C-alpha cells in the first residue's frame, strides 16, 4: 500500500472504444504490469525473433486470453502517478460493472470516459455518463481515443468534443470541468507524454491530468457507517465482523449498534491488516470485536453505527432511479432484488410517482403507468426484509443501489428520503 493519497478511478465508455487497451497502456506506462507477464511476453517475442518487448504483445495476449474465455480482470488493477496511488475500479463490460459501480463495492472518486474518435458518442457512452452523474462522480477526464485511426485529425477531435460536451450538458455535468485529451491507447499518444502527432494540442497528457485531479475528501464528519461484509468466529477472540468503514470512525470503547439486526454493544478491539489500531476511518477495511455479540446475531448486509445515531432502517423509501435495461416495462408491484452496500434484499416498487426527463431531471409526468429502459423516475420502494439504507444527500456512501433481476442490472438509483420503520 502506498502512502500517497488514494484515488478510485472508473474507466467508462462504450464497448470497443478502447477501455481495456487504455487500462493496459496505463499499467504499462507506469511500470505496473506484473513482472511475470512482461517476462512471459519477452520470451515469446524473442522466440518469434522479435527482440524487444512491445506493448502490443501485452494487448495481444490479453485479447487471446479473453477469446479463451479467461477474462482479464481489469478491475482492481493499481498504478501510481507522482502524487496519487490509483485503483482502477470495475470497468464496464465487466459483467458486474454496473452493479459494482453503484453499490459502492467500488465507489469511484473520478472517471475517465473513453470515446472513440472514429465513432463518437454511442449508446453506452450516454448510459455511463448518466450513471457517473447519478452516482456523484464529479471530475471527468475524456480521452478521445483511436486518434491514430483518424490520422490525428484536429477537426475530428473537435467534432467529438462538441458531441460529448452536448451530452454532458444534457445530464447537467459541469462541462467546464471536463478535461479533453486526444489519445491513442494503442500507440501511446498523449497517455504518458505529449505526442508530436497532435502538435495542435497543448494540454496535458492523460497521466498528467490524472495527477492533477483534486484529492478526494473523505467524509469524517458523518456518523460511523460500516456495512458488514462477513462475520467470522476467531478462536480466542470470538465473533469478528469485517467490513469497510464508509463514513465516520470506529475505536475501541465505542458503543455501537448493528441494523437491521438491532443488536449492539461496546467495541473491544479494532484490527487492520492483522494489527490492532486505536481508530479506523473512511476507506479502511477492518475486523472488530463487539462485547456480547455472537456469530448468529449479525450478518452480511447489516450496517454498524453509533448507538446514539444508529443506521436507518427503511419501512419504505423514495428513490430516483434510471432504468438501464429491462425487456419490457416496469409497473407498480414489480419486486426485483436491490443491492445496496453489502445488502441484497428483494424490494417491491410500490408506486411510480414521477417520470423525469433524464437530461434535465425535471418532472415529465406525474404518476405514470409504467417506466421502461432509458427512463428516469421517482419511485416508492418497500423492502421485503429489513434493509438499512440512508438518504444520499446525507450519507451518499449508503444512499445508492443497483436493481438486479434475471441476472442483469435493470436499474440504478439513489435514495431521496427514508420512511423509518
UniProtKB/Swiss-Prot annotation:
Amino acids binding GTP: 13-20, 90-94, 145-148
Region annotated G2, chain positions: 69-73
Region (G3): 90-93
Residue segments, region G4: 145-148
Compartments, record wording: Cytoplasm
Superkingdom assignment: Archaea
Catalytic activity: GTP + H2O = GDP + phosphate + H(+)
Residues given in the record as Mg(2+) binding sites: 20
Domain tr-type G: 4-220
Region (G5): 184-186
Key words, A-Z: Cytoplasm, Elongation factor, GTP-binding, Hydrolase, Magnesium, Metal-binding, Nucleotide-binding, Protein biosynthesis
Keyword Metal-binding: yes
SUPFAM superfamilies given in the database record: EF-Tu/eEF-1alpha/eIF2-gamma C-terminal domain, P-loop containing nucleoside triphosphate hydrolases, Translation proteins
Primary localization class, coarse: cytoplasm
Membrane-spanning ranges: none
GO terms under cellular component: cytoplasm
Keyword field contains Hydrolase: yes
Physiological role: GTP hydrolase that promotes the GTP-dependent binding of aminoacyl-tRNA to the A-site of ribosomes during protein biosynthesis.
Family, per entry: Belongs to the TRAFAC class translation factor GTPase superfamily. Classic translation factor GTPase family. EF-Tu/EF-1A subfamily.
UniProt-recorded name of the protein: Elongation factor 1-alpha
Organism listed in the record: Haloquadratum walsbyi (strain DSM 16790 / HBSQ001)
Gene (UniProt): tuf
Amino acid at each position: 500500500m502506498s502512502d500517497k493519497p488514494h484515488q478510485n478511478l472508473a474507466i467508462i465508455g462504450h464497448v470497443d472504444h478502447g477501455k481495456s487497451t487504455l487500462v493496459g497502456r496505463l499499467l504499462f506506462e507506469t511500470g505496473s504490469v506484473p513482472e511475470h507477464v512482461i517476462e512471459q511476453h519477452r520470451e515469446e517475442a524473442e522466440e518469434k525473433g522479435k527482440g524487444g518487448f512491445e506493448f502490443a504483445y501485452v494487448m495481444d495476449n490479453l485479447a487471446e486470453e479473453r477469446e479463451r474465455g479467461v477474462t482479464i480482470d481489469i478491475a482492481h488493477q493499481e498504478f501510481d502517478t507522482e502524487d496519487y496511488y490509483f485503483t482502477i475500479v470495475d470497468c464496464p463490460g465487466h459483467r458486474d460493472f454496473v452493479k459494482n459501480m453503484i453499490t459502492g463495492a467500488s465507489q469511484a472518486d473520478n472517471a475517465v470516459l473513453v470515446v472513440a474518435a472514429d465513432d463518437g458518442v454511442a449508446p453506452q457512452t450516454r448510459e455511463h455518463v448518466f450513471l457517473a452523474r447519478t452516482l456523484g462522480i464529479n471530475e471527468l477526464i475524456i480521452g478521445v481515443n483511436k486518434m491514430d485511426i483518424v490520422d490525428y485529425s484536429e477537426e475530428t477531435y473537435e467534432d467529438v468534443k462538441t458531441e460529448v460536451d452536448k451530452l454532458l450538458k444534457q445530464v447537467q455535468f459541469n462541462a467546464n470541468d471536463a478535461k479533453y485529451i486526444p489519445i491513442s491507447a494503442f500507440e501511446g499518444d498523449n497517455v504518458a507524454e505529449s505526442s508530436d502527432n497532435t502538435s495542435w494540442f497543448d494540454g496535458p497528457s492523460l497521466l498528467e491530468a490524472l495527477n492533477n485531479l483534486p484529492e478526494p475528501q473523505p467524509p469524517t464528519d458523518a456518523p460511523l457507517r460500516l456495512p458488514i461484509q462477513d462475520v467470522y468466529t476467531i478462536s480466542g477472540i470470538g465473533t469478528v465482523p469485517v467490513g469497510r468503514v464508509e463514513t465516520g470512525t470506529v475505536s475501541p470503547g465505542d458503543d455501537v449498534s448493528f441494523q437491521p439486526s438491532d443488536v449492539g454493544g461496546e467495541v473491544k478491539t479494532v484490527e487492520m491488516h492483522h494489527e490492532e489500531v486505536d481508530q479506523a476511518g473512511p476507506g479502511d477495511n477492518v475486523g472488530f470485536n463487539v462485547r456480547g455479540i455472537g456469530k448468529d446475531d449479525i450478518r452480511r448486509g447489516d450496517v454498524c453505527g453509533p448507538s446514539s445515531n444508529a443506521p436507518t432502517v427503511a419501512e419504505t423509501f423514495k428513490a430516483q432511479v434510471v432504468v438501464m435495461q429491462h425487456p419490457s416495462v416496469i409497473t407498480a408491484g414489480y419486486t426485483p432484488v436491490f443491492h445496496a452496500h453489502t445488502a441484497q434484499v428483494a424490494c417491491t416498487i410500490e408506486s411510480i410517482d414521477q417520470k423525469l426527463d433524464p437530461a434535465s431531471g425535471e418532472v415529465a409526468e406525474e404518476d405514470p403507468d409504467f417506466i421502461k429502459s432509458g427512463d428516469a423516475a421517482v419511485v416508492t420502494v418497500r423492502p421485503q426484509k429489513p434493509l438499512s439504507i440512508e438518504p444520499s444527500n446525507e450519507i451518499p456512501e449508503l444512499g445508492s443501489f443497483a436493481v438486479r433481476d434475471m441476472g442483469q442490472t435493470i436499474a440504478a438509483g439513489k435514495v431521496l428520503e427514508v420512511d423509518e420503520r
